[in-house]
């Protein structure tokens, strides 16, 4: 199986393979044409929802049984993801505040920076973190200081997959590595890591997230009042702010979405009896868990208010004088970037431009990068061989069973 790692051009053949998701929301979620007329008559704020990363399927509709049936199917699906995320000692390691926690926070910071740099939708960033957590909880992936490049390779692969799932024009794997990453990998190495992530997650990449429910739940809790773009933006902000806090890994996406909707409606000036609102809305969620999730959000908001740093500081970065860590790239390729054709710079190489004063340091990093690049390639080759061996054993067992029958 190959990957299309170069930019699409008008001359590219239509049959070229890529991981770009060509399905629309209806084919993914099993919707039919009946939803077209409903979508066309929705409030203009739906356009705002879609621009923020909500798809039409995320607005599950109001009235009738279709929306409730979709909610039920999504809640069944999210249970499987909860099992994956809570498996093993992953949450325990994060709760202990060790290197796993610091690496996860650094990963989310970088993902958010790239999201802001390319103006990705919020769902793209959320999916990248979702893939990261599910992968780390599903395999024995040792986070150590000896191989920091391994962590960066995994993060890039998760974000690349999320961009291919959600963005209509996902950048190439090399272009994706902006905002001063410590290591930069070549396309082949990243694609190998993508395959490892895909197989580990059993190709279940259309994850259920709080964004899946928020439009429907907000409409229920807001009691039919107009859903404004301010409410939608506030929901998005709170959902993204929950990514770093590991306490929210213990809650289902539906519970997070309910707590977010309650918080946003209450912040709008309405006095809510949370228990009464949940009872009247008839949302199929655990009310006790929603209460605990809402309390965690209030505590998180209090910490952010008392912090001297601005909440937007995590998204601030300096791209005026970036330094390219040329790991995995050839020295001649690194040097050529500073004098490459103008069209290449306009197509995405500008963030990697190297100044003359940085040339010597970049060459030193290239030499060190080849050594680390060999380690990354060796890891991917070993993982590929292990996967092929596992698939082969499974095939032999199936043949034996078929022969016995």
Swiss-Prot record:
List keywords of the entry alphabetically. Cell cycle, Cell division, Cyclin
Q: Which GO terms describe its molecular function?
A: cyclin-dependent protein serine/threonine kinase regulator activity
Gene Ontology terms, cellular component aspect?
cyclin-dependent protein kinase holoenzyme complex; cytoplasm; nucleus
Under PANTHER family, the record lists: CYCLINS
Concerning InterPro entries, the annotation shows:
Cyclin, Cyclin-like_dom, Cyclin-like_sf, Cyclin_C-dom, Cyclin_N, Cyclins_cyclin-box
Stated family: Belongs to the cyclin family. Cyclin D subfamily.
Against Pfam families, the record matches this protein to: Cyclin_C (PF02984), Cyclin_N (PF00134)
Q: From the Swiss-Prot or TrEMBL record, give the protein name.
A: Putative cyclin-D2-3
- Region of interest (Disordered), ranges: 377-405
- In this chain, composition skew of type Basic and acidic residues spans 384-405
Gene3D superfamilies per the record? Answer: Cyclin-like
* GO biological process terms, semicolon-separated: cell division; G1/S transition of mitotic cell cycle
Organism equals Oryza sativa subsp. japonica
The question of whether Metal-binding is a record keyword is answered with: no
Has keyword Translocase? no
């Amino acid at each position: 199986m190959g990957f299309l790692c170069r930019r699409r051009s008008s001359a590219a053949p239509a049959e070229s393979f890529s991981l770009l998701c060509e399905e629309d929301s209806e084919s993914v979620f099993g919707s039919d044409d009946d939803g077209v007329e409903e979508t066309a008559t929705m409030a203009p704020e739906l356009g705002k929802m879609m621009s923020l990363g909500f798809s039409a399927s995320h607005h599950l509709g109001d009235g009738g049984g279709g929306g409730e049936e979709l909610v039920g199917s999504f809640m069944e699906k999210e249970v499987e993801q909860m099992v994956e995320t809570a498996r093993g000692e992953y949450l325990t390691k994060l709760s202990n505040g060790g290197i796993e926690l610091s690496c996860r926070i650094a990963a989310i910071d970088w993902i958010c920076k790239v999201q802001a740099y390319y103006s990705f939708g919020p769902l793209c960033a959320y999916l990248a973190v979702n893939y990261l957590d599910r992968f780390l909880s599903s395999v024995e992936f040792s986070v150590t200081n000896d191989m920091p490049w391994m962590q960066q390779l995994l993060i890039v692969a998760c974000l690349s997959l999320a961009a291919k799932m959600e963005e209509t024009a996902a950048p190439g794997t090399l272009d994706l590595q902006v905002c001063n990453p410590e290591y930069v990998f070549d396309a082949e190495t990243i694609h190998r890591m993508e395959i490892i992530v895909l197989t580990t997650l059993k190709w279940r990449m259309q994850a259920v997230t709080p964004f899946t429910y928020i439009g429907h739940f907000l409409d229920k809790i807001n009691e039919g009042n107009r859903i404004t773009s301010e409410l939608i933006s506030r929901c998005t902000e709170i959902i993204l702010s929950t990514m770093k806090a590991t306490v929210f890994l213990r809650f289902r996406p539906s519970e997070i979405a309910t707590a977010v909707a309650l918080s946003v409606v209450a912040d709008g000036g309405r006095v809510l009896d949370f228990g009464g609102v949940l009872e009247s809305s008839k949302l199929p969620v655990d009310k006790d868990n929603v209460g605990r999730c809402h309390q965690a959000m209030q505590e998180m908001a209090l910490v952010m208010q008392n912090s001297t740093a601005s909440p937007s500081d995590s998204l601030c970065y300096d791209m005026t004088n970036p330094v390219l860590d040329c790991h995995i790239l050839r020295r001649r390729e690194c040097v050529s970037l500073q004098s490459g054709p103008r069209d290449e710079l306009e197509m995405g190489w500008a963030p990697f431009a190297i100044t003359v004063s940085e040339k010597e340091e970049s060459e030193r990093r290239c030499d060190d990068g080849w050594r680390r690049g060999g380690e990354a390639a060796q890891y991917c080759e070993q993982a590929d061989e292990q996967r092929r061996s596992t698939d082969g054993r499974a095939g032999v067992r199936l043949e034996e069973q078929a022969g016995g029958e």
